[in-house]
Amino acid sequence: MSGKWRLVLTGIGNPEPQYAGTRHNVGLYMLELLRKRLGLQGRTYSPVPNTGGKVHYIEDEHCTILRSDGQYMNLSGEQVCKVWARYAKYQARHVVIHDELSVACGKVQLRAPSTSIRGHNGLRSLLKCSGGRVPFAKLAIGIGREPGSRSRDPASVSRWVLGALTPQELQTLLTQSEPAAWRALTQYIS
């Protein structure tokens, strides 16, 4: 990439610390792992002005990391899109990191901006609030469905995604998902 460009990585999840360590917050967990790869682990998040403390950021010359962790994921679009508007002057590449039921734990998919949101309510909120004017790629971090269940019953799905990650799932995210996410991200921005 040349010229005045910026990578904007946005991790979405539910309010922390209440939902920290849940499958639904795997986007925020992966954001932290990628932050280390980007060499930004020593920097402190700052609240983004005019978001009521619901979005925090770290940035350097070419990268901005946004954490939407102060409100429910399904409502994240309103505050995140206010922040995204600040990057309109750049050739910004937006990537949203989120949990994905339809992808097995340990697997990662980077999907182009024009692809489906697959019924993900956090992505739906971002799409709605941006009015489709901010194209964003989707970095789907697989959490899979509950073992032995193919249910799409909202109560079952909610129980699963709001459940705590097991030690085995955390290990899989660290050893399989994070390297795969890093490879996908570096290919996307090169």
From Swiss-Prot:
Enzyme Commission number: 3.1.1.29
Keyword tRNA-binding: yes
GO terms assigned for molecular function: peptidyl-tRNA hydrolase activity; tRNA binding
Reaction catalysis annotation: an N-acyl-L-alpha-aminoacyl-tRNA + H2O = an N-acyl-L-amino acid + a tRNA + H(+)
Principal EC category: hydrolase
Localisation per UniProt entry: Mitochondrion
The keyword Nucleus belongs to this UniProt entry's keyword annotation: no
Site (Stabilizes the basic form of H active site to accept a proton): 99
Key words of the record: Hydrolase, Mitochondrion, RNA-binding, tRNA-binding
Example of a GO cellular component annotation carried by this entry: mitochondrion
Amino-acid positions noted as binding tRNA in the UniProt annotation, renumbered to this chain: 19, 72, 74, 121
GO biological process: mitochondrial translation
Active site: 24 (proton acceptor)
Disruption phenotype: Not essential, it can be deleted.
Record function comment: Peptidyl-tRNA hydrolase involved in the recycling of tRNA-Lys from diacetyl-lysyl-tRNA-Lys and is important for mitochondrial function.
Note: Present with 339 molecules/cell in log phase SD medium.
Family (UniProt): Belongs to the PTH family.
This protein's name: Peptidyl-tRNA hydrolase
Lineage: Eukaryota, Fungi, Dikarya, Ascomycota, Saccharomycotina
Gene that specifies this protein: PTH1
